[in-house]
Each structure stands twice: as structure tokens, then as C-alpha cells.
UniProtKB/Swiss-Prot annotation:
Protein name: DNA-directed RNA polymerase subunit alpha
Lineage: Eukaryota, Viridiplantae, Streptophyta, Embryophyta, Tracheophyta
Location (main, coarse): plastid
A GO term for molecular function: protein dimerization activity
Any one GO biological process: DNA-templated transcription
GO CC annotation, single: mitochondrion
Enzymatic class: transferase
Keyword Chloroplast: yes
SUPFAM superfamilies, sorted: C-terminal domain of RNA polymerase alpha subunit, Insert subdomain of RNA polymerase alpha subunit, RBP11-like subunits of RNA polymerase
Annotated SMART domains: RPOLD
Subunit and partners: In plastids the minimal PEP RNA polymerase catalytic core is composed of four subunits: alpha, beta, beta', and beta''. When a (nuclear-encoded) sigma factor is associated with the core the holoenzyme is formed, which can initiate transcription.
């Protein structure tokens, strides 16, 4: 983290992407600014985003490989240049992009002699390879070579104890960290009581998502951490008991919606997030699992789409309708609501 003094000031809080580039298929770079911030706020935001970007962003990777009758991971296979351990290390480096949840199966089945690359992996429909040229192994003889793989979406660094599995499968230390590196710096501007801070944030990703997408997901994760405080009343604590301990947010959904109604261009539904709709924790979590993050996402769904969501009930549908009816103009509901 670097702190410098610079001249200049801004009047309204805003963020902006000032630089974005693709260095390679597996290296994306983005540079962002957020300003103006009061003294100390830039450090608070920078530290929180750094932790969220490096530890809370989900990634997809190969977590297990099954070779068949291989005694241990240091074995060599006739007709293959690499050892089993080297193949496992190569599989660990494969960068995948997906929105899957849970474990999925994949496989490789080829005939030599030839080079095996990531392009040879047979994947489920929900998964794609970022760089198909990543090497896996070199078959030097005309042999049939097959591997069964497991793919999982997770976060952080996952390790498993090394042991010989009777079915010939071996765990791969999963690195589910799309953000490869991150740096933030703070610049001070203004004089006297008008002094503000500007936060610069640099993000490098592995290509499975862009720096802008990573920043969005990290921000959403941080918001999710504080949602239980906003839904304290639902957990059995009355508002009367909490009103002296809890200050409602300055910019509530209703106030923001009122401002948006004044916009002649109409309500930007993609700027209203579902956590602003005062939904119950249960309904909110159901929508989040279905990748419904904004009001635009919600209003584009039919009743059938919502009922197909795992654990979604008719009571949730009624709760959503009552909430939207409470906050949105009735003509907007008639025009936009699909259910």
C-alpha cells in the first residue's frame, strides 16, 4: 500500500475504471479509483476489498484425477513422458470458467502419440476452458490414455492429505483463487477541512473473470456479510428492542427509488439490487443461488422460472410480489412483471 499527496479534488463519490488490458488469456489487469473518501475511509475500503478479492472470490478448478491402476503419484506410465505427479501439477494449473455449484465430472480420453492439452478435456456444458493450449502430457507411443476428473467450484486454497486410493484417484490441491494479485494505494487531495482521499485499486485475474467482475463479486460478498444486521428483526428481535442500537442506512431503497422515479429516462432496474427490497433472508438466499442479483434480473423471470429454484416456495413468490407492489409504481409492475 502506497500513500501520496496529490493536488485536486472531486465533489461527488464515484468509482471509475481508469485502465483495463488483457496481457494474455490467463492474465487480465484492471485499475480502478474511488473518490472522494474521508480520511481513513480509503484504508478501510482498501483492506476490506483486498481480503474479499483474495479470499472470497469463487473459482472453478480440477480437484481430483483418476488414472486407473497406478500404484502411487510418483509412478511413470509407459508411453508417457511425464510422471503421474507432473500430470497432476499440470492439471492443477488449468484455468476454468463456470457458474456451477457442487462437483461435476470431466474426462480425457485420447490415443497417442500426441500432445495432450486442456482442449482435450471433455467438460460438462456449464464449464469452459480459459486457455485451451495449456499442456497436460506428451504421449510418445500409440497408447490409449484416459483420465477421469472431478471439477469443483470453491474459494481459497484447499489441500487434502496424500494417500494411495484403491480406485486409482489422486487429490489435486485446489487453488480456487481467480484473483492472482492485488494492490491498492491512497492519494490525499485538497487542503484543510476540504481534504479527501482517493483510493486506487489494481487487480490482476487469471482470465476466468475480469477485474471488474471480481470487484463486483467482492463488493457483493462484503454486503452479504452485513445483511444479518439488516434482518435482525426477522430473527425474533423486535424493532422496539433494536431501535436504540441500530441506525437505518441513510440511502434506503424507498429513497433511492423516489430519486429514480424523478429521472425522465426511467428507472434503471439493473441498478437496484435485491438486498434493497427488504426481502426475508430465506427469499433473498433463494434468489442469490439462482444468480438473481438486481431488480432487472428478477423482473425478467417468469413464475415457472422462480418455482424451479431449489427450496423456492409459493410463499416466497407472494412475498416478492407484496414487496414489489409496495415499492414500485403499479404501471411498472404491469409492464415488467412476468408472473
Amino acid at each position: 500500500m502506497v500513500r501520496e499527496e496529490v493536488a485536486g479534488s472531486t465533489q461527488t463519490l464515484q468509482w471509475k475504471c481508469v485502465e483495463s488490458r488483457v496481457d494474455s488469456k490467463r492474465l487480465y489487469y484492471g485499475r480502478f479509483i474511488l473518490s472522494p473518501l474521508r480520511k481513513g475511509q480509503a484504508d478501510t475500503v482498501g483492506i476490506a476489498l483486498r481480503r474479499a478479492l483474495l479470499g472470497e472470490i469463487e473459482g472453478t478448478c480440477i480437484t481430483r484425477a483418476k488414472f486407473g491402476s497406478v500404484p502411487h503419484e510418483y509412478s511413470t506410465i509407459a508411453g508417457i513422458e511425464e510422471s503421474v505427479q507432473e500430470i497432476l501439477l499440470n492439471l492443477k494449473e488449468i484455468v476454468l470458467r463456470s457458474n456451477l455449484y457442487g462437483v461435476r465430472d470431466a474426462s480425457i480420453c485420447v490415443k497417442g502419440p500426441r500432445y495432450i492439452t486442456a482442449q482435450d478435456i471433455i467438460l460438462p456444458p456449464s464449464v469452459e476452458i480459459v486457455d485451451t493450449a495449456q499442456p497436460i502430457a506428451n504421449l510418445t507411443e500409440p497408447i490409449d490414455f484416459c483420465i477421469d476428473l472431478q471439477i469443483k467450484r470453491d474459494r481459497g486454497y484447499q489441500t487434502e492429505l496424500r494417500k494411495n486410493y484403491q480406485d486409482g484417484s489422486y487429490p489435486i490441491d485446489a487453488v480456487s483463487m481467480p484473483v492472482r494479485n492485488l494492490n491498492y494505494s491512497i492519494f490525499s487531495c485538497g487542503n484543510g477541512n476540504e481534504k479527501h482521499e482517493i483510493l486506487f485499486l489494481e487487480i490482476w485475474t487469471n482470465g476466468s473473470l475480469t477485474p471488474k467482475e471480481a470487484l463486483y463479486e467482492a463488493s457483493r460478498n462484503l454486503i452479504d456479510l452485513f445483511l444479518p444486521f439488516l434482518h435482525a428483526e426477522e430473527e425474533g428481535t423486535s424493532f422496539e428492542e433494536n431501535k436504540n442500537r441500530f441506525t437505518p442506512p441513510l440511502f434506503t431503497f424507498q429513497k433511492r427509488l423516489t430519486n429514480l422515479k424523478k429521472n425522465k429516462k426511467g428507472i434503471p432496474l439493473n441498478c437496484i439490487f435485491i438486498d434493497q427490497l427488504e426481502l426475508t433472508s430465506r427469499t433473498y438466499n433463494c434468489l442469490k443461488r439462482a444468480n438473481i442479483h438486481t431488480l432487472l434480473d428478477l423482473l425478467s423471470k417468469t413464475e415457472e422460472d422462480l418455482l424451479r429454484i431449489d427450496s423456492f416456495r409459493m410463499e416466497d413468490r407472494k412475498h416478492i410480489w407484496d414487496t414489489l407492489e409496495k415499492h414500485l409504481p403499479i404501471d411498472l409492475l404491469k409492464n415488467k412483471l412476468s408472473f
